[in-house]
């Protein structure tokens, strides 16, 4: 290691990384001089050399990427260019010039002593494991350039002047978790039956993109640091604090949490006259995080709908720029939902002290107390229809969500404790006027889709979901979920042991959330239409299996010696009641005897955790998994800008307003995240390059009848009715105990009032996380932003993209 190649630390600006090609410090991650024609195995060296002569130090990486693709006339080379850029600029390849083991051993001032000792003692074994991992890290598992860039920007660790590469990050995480598991007896006993070493087990999960831990966890696990957390979500109830107390908490808690990259949720309903100054404070701190660090964070503001300050906060919601990472969430009691059903009804809001007192009542007593306050106390009235219109305007901006207070009370596993929500995806967790956190893990469902083998044809439906020549391997998924619950508990124990500054919120319930990610990718891989009966059935079965495996594993932890979590005796689990028991007419696929035994075992041994399964997406981490963000047919910018981009030459005459062109190249980009569409219809490339991919315009003159039927799985999100979406979600509600956040695509003909009532009556705890209105889908586009290749909502194959960049 070059002793001169050290990192310089500036406390105000963070790390100044030393360029490995020049003898100078540079804050930029990429050094473009390292990218020259000798590194490209292409024939068009003359065109590339012309590009390179135009390069300068301020050139954006995406400019370089698109310039290379343009010069190559890259019909099929864009994915390869992405991988090449990823390897040379981001060091995502396993054969990196920096040895991960040596880098860890030489970073004693940055990494924990136990981690260093573990690596030193297991060096030979780790080298063999890493060699095996190289074979796993094939091209299809390597992240695209933008996914890798975002991942490394979020992690942003520098060891002795060398930026951590992805193999080093994965090794650091795996070694830290393996070391933690070996120290804790109940975890060690749970992993004892596994054949391969712990480090290898965890490494393979990460390398194969089976799962992804939260970015704060990936960034901070194993490091010696202060004011850092492994948790990416945190809720702090400040509704009973004075403004002075809030400002004090903000400096000591909220800002460090934002700088950590965690999503912060806060109840600010009681603040009325102070609302404007509070918003300015929070927005300024969000800007500080965005400007001075590589972290991204978000803020969710919870509003109780019976407060007088409600309308002021709704006004703030309407004027906030759509680019600001702030969400508002309304807490709706039963009486409001009943009045919503009635035309010409009115809603009453109360002044600060009375409204705060009203919010302390349990939902079972809330309605009677609310009616009493309406009769006896001073209040303001607003027509319910007018209030709903104000709310819908915020919904159209994509910055409003709902919580149904009655459903949380009815379906909560902790009935004695008021429950609110948490995080950017509105996950439901319990709290008692304090701090709460949860540990979330993204599970990539597309990993479990396989071709049918002769051996698998004999398996029962409990282990395999069959559809034509594909299967969804439920047995493999249950095994993986078991491992993830154990890993989650290891992270929680690690946080408590290392005095994590958000650790207080995890102690009582030890909340876990296995986030269901990539369902839509899995359905497309199986050629299953998203809204089909079989598609809905698979989603319900998946959630049932995840919930059962999670609860069973948590119980086994206690059976092997762990103490039940603090809130267990106060929960319905202590009575042998499962979350799915709270719902009527639940359909089960797993045998009843398994559920019966699970209930009795829980009463006997207890549970290490209280929440388990989330339908919410992890909005940053999913991109590295190379799958759809959630179970909804939506693909945002992040998932489309990566190595699975195919390029077709544009038609010089036809310029549809539904086509997407880059600023300089005028090249039509068609993202296909599983390659299914272009592979199937490769004989129709000429047609595809001249039409706008509107499925309704495709006819039998261009495709065979069989192809026409297959194309029905490629629908734009707006082609599904909200009722179709609800049918899928409702079946899995009994098994999604933690978060039920949903994105709905609403056409002009669909009534927001009806949708809200339907969600409420079907037992959703959290309602709409985001509503996308068809006539509003072009909002928030910044035409001056270069190479925003795709923005919008599709099912992975872009049938109807949205913007033209001139």
From Swiss-Prot:
Please verify whether the record's keywords include Transport: no
Single biological process term from Gene Ontology = deoxyribonucleotide biosynthetic process
Q: Name one GO molecular function term.
A: ribonucleoside-diphosphate reductase activity, thioredoxin disulfide as acceptor
Q: Which regions form coiled coils?
A: none
| Protein localization | Virion; Host cytoplasm
Q: Which UniProt keywords apply?
A: Host cytoplasm, Late protein, Virion
Q: Which GO cellular component does the record give, naming just one? A: host cell cytoplasm
- Check the record and name the PANTHER family matching this protein: RIBONUCLEOSIDE-DIPHOSPHATE REDUCTASE LARGE CHAIN (PTHR11573), RIBONUCLEOSIDE-DIPHOSPHATE REDUCTASE LARGE SUBUNIT (PTHR11573:SF6)
Write out the similarity annotation. Belongs to the ribonucleoside diphosphate reductase large chain family.
* The name this protein goes by in its record: Ribonucleoside-diphosphate reductase large subunit-like protein
């Amino acid at each position: 290691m070059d002793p001169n190649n050290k990192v310089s630390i500036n406390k105000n600006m963070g790390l100044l990384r030393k360029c490995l090609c020049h003898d100078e410090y540079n804050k930029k991650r990429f050094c473009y001089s390292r990218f020259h024609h000798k590194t490209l195995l292409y024939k068009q060296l003359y065109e590339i050399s012309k590009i390179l002569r135009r390069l300068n130090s301020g050139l954006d990486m995406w400019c370089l990427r698109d310039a290379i693709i343009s010069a190559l006339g890259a019909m099929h080379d864009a994915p390869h260019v992405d991988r090449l850029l990823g390897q040379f600029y981001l060091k995502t390849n396993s054969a990196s010039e920096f040895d991960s083991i040596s880098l860890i051993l030489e970073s004693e001032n940055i990494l924990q002593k136990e981690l260093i000792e573990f690596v030193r003692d297991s060096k030979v074994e780790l080298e063999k494991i890493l060699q095996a991992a190289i074979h796993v890290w094939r091209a299809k598992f390597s992240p695209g350039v933008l996914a890798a860039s975002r991942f490394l920007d979020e992690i942003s660790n520098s060891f002795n002047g060398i930026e951590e590469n992805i193999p080093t990050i994965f090794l650091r995480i795996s070694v830290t978790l393996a070391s933690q598991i070996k120290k804790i007896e109940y975890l060690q006993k749970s992993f004892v039956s596994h054949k391969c070493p712990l480090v290898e087990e965890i490494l393979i999960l990460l390398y194969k993109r089976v799962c992804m831990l939260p970015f704060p966890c990936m960034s901070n696990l194993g490091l010696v640091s202060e004011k850092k957390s492994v948790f990416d979500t945190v809720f702090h109830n400040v509704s009973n604090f004075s403004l002075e107390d809030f400002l004090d908490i903000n400096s000591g808690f909220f800002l460090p949490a934002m700088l950590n990259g965690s999503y912060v949720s806060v109840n600010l309903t009681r603040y009325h006259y102070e609302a404007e100054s509070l918003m300015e404070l929070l927005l300024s701190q969000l800007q500080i995080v965005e400007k001075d660090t590589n972290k991204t964070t978000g803020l969710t503001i919870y509003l109780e709908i019976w407060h007088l300050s409600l309308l002021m906060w709704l006004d703030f919601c309407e004027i906030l720029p759509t680019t600001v990472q702030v969400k508002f969430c309304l807490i709706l009691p039963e009486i409001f939902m009943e009045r919503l059903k009635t035309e010409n009804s009115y809603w009453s809001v109360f002044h600060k002290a009375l409204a705060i007192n009203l919010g302390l009542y349990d939902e079972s007593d809330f309605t009677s107390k609310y009616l009493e306050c309406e009769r006896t106390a001073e209040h303001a009235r607003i027509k319910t229809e007018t209030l709903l219109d104000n709310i819908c305007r915020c919904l159209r901006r994509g910055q409003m969500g709902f919580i149904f207070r009655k459903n949380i009370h009815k379906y909560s596993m902790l009935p004695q404790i008021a429950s609110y929500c948490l995080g950017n995806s509105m996950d439901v967790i319990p709290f008692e006027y304090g701090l709460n956190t949860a540990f979330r893990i993204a599970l990539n469902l597309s990993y479990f889709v396989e071709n049918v083998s002769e051996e698998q044809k004999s398996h029962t439906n409990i282990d395999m979901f069959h559809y034509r020549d594909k299967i969804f391997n439920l047995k493999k998924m249950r095994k993986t979920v078991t491992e993830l619950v154990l890993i989650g508990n290891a992270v929680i124990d690690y946080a408590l042991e290392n005095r994590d500054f958000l650790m207080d919120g995890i102690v009582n319930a030890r909340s876990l959330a296995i986030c269901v990610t990539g369902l839509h990718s899995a359905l497309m891989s199986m050629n299953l239409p998203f809204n089909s009966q079989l598609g809905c059935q698979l989603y319900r079965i998946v959630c049932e299996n995840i919930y059962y495996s999670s609860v069973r594993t948590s119980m086994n932890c206690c059976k092997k010696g762990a103490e039940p979590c603090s809130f267990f005796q106060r929960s319905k689990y202590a009575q042998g009641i499962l979350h799915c028991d709270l719902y009527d007419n639940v359909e089960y696929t797993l045998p009843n005897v398994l559920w019966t035994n699970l209930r009795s075992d829980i009463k006997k041994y207890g549970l290490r955790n209280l929440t388990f399964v989330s339908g919410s997406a992890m909005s940053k981490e999913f991109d590295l998994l190379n799958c759809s963000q959630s179970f909804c047919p939506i693909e945002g910018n992040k998932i489309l800008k990566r190595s699975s981009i195919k390029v077709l030459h544009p038609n010089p005459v036809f310029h549809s307003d539904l086509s997407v062109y880059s600023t300089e190249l005028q090249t039509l980009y068609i993202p296909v995240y599983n390659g299914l569409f272009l592979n199937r219809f490769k004989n129709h490339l000429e047609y595809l390059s001249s039409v706008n991919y509107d499925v309704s315009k495709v006819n039998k003159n261009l495709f065979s009848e069989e192809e026409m039927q297959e194309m029905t799985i490629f629908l734009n999100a707006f082609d599904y009715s909200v009722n179709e979406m609800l049918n899928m979600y409702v079946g899995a509600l009994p098994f999604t105990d933690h978060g039920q956040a949903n994105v709905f695509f609403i056409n002009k003909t669909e009534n927001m009032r009806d949708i809200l009532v339907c969600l409420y009556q079907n037992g959703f705890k959290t309602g709409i996380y985001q509503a996308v209105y068809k006539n509003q889908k072009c909002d928030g586009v910044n035409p001056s932003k270069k190479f925003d290749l795709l923005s919008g909502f599709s099912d992975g194959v872009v049938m109807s993209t949205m913007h033209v960049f001139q």
